[in-house]
Swiss-Prot record:
GO terms for molecular function: ion channel inhibitor activity; toxin activity. Belongs to the conotoxin M superfamily. Expressed by the venom duct. Coiled coil: none annotated. Pfam families: Conotoxin. It comes from Conus ventricosus. This is Conotoxin VnMMSK-03.
Amino acid sequence: MMSKLGVVLTICLLPFPLTALPMDGDQPADLPALRTQDFEPERSPWFDPVKRCCSQDCRVCIPCCPY
């Protein structure tokens, strides 16, 4: 009986491998520190209001100005 169950599971899972499912690790990386708080780049000391981007320290201030 167990061997029949194994054959059925193998036949069912063979065309649909578990790697086809999207995993959390496949998601693009983002900045978790900025997600957990209300981040306002306009209040950052590096934010340039004319260009509407951050001129320095792009690790903590987004959007970053192109050089």
